[in-house]
Amino acid sequence: MRIGNGYDVHRLAPGQKLVLGGVEIPFECGLIGWSDADVLTHAIMDSLLGAAALGDIGLYFPPGDPKYKGISSLKLLEQVTDLLAKKGFGIINVDSVIVAEEPKLRGHIDTMRKHLAKAMGIDPGRVGIKASTSEQLGFVGRQEGMVAWAVALVDEK
């Protein structure tokens, strides 16, 4: 078995869509990025790639590449899952945390788990997501951005 961790951060801006775990969440601001800026899914992808010692998402999906402009991060997660399978790895489970002051995410977590599990080809019971705040400290506390951390456990087949 191998373990990997992932981290991602994106800035918030008015007029952008907020997508977390593949779920569009109603909010006056969204995350800025080349793809859909899904900070949670990006952290999960990095944790999976790290567990398999395959680099990070920037290596496979470089910002600025026109084919990834606005793409759903769930589609990228499917590609990462396929890459791991081709390299002989299976996903055991993923756990994650999103840090954001607003919006409150509790009501969206089950749907996020289902979307992420489907993209990874695993049971939703193997996907953990927690939501926390930064207690109004730092750039997250000022609602300038969001952060996500993830850890993945994979096995070699």
UniProtKB/Swiss-Prot annotation:
Keywords: Isoprene biosynthesis, Lyase, Metal-binding. Gene3D superfamilies: 2-C-methyl-D-erythritol 2,4-cyclodiphosphate synthase. Pathway: Isoprenoid biosynthesis; isopentenyl diphosphate biosynthesis via DXP pathway; isopentenyl diphosphate from 1-deoxy-D-xylulose 5-phosphate: step 4/6. One of its GO terms (biological process) is isopentenyl diphosphate biosynthetic process, methylerythritol 4-phosphate pathway. GO terms for molecular function: 2-C-methyl-D-erythritol 2,4-cyclodiphosphate synthase activity; metal ion binding. 4-CDP-2-C-methyl-D-erythritol 2-phosphate binds at residues 8-10, 56-58, 132-135, 139, 142. It catalyses: 4-CDP-2-C-methyl-D-erythritol 2-phosphate = 2-C-methyl-D-erythritol 2,4-cyclic diphosphate + CMP. A divalent metal cation binds at residues 8, 10, 42. The record marks 133 as: Transition state stabilizer. PROSITE patterns: ISPF. Its cofactor is a divalent metal cation. It is an enzyme of class 4 (lyase). It holds the Pfam family YgbB. Its EC number is 4.6.1.12. Homotrimer. NCBIfam families: ispF. Belongs to the IspF family. Involved in the biosynthesis of isopentenyl diphosphate (IPP) and dimethylallyl diphosphate (DMAPP), two major building blocks of isoprenoid compounds. Catalyzes the conversion of 4-diphosphocytidyl-2-C-methyl-D-erythritol 2-phosphate (CDP-ME2P) to 2-C-methyl-D-erythritol 2,4-cyclodiphosphate (ME-CPP) with a corresponding release of cytidine 5-monophosphate (CMP). This is 2-C-methyl-D-erythritol 2,4-cyclodiphosphate synthase. The lineage of its organism: Bacteria, Bacillati, Chloroflexota, Dehalococcoidia, Dehalococcoidales.
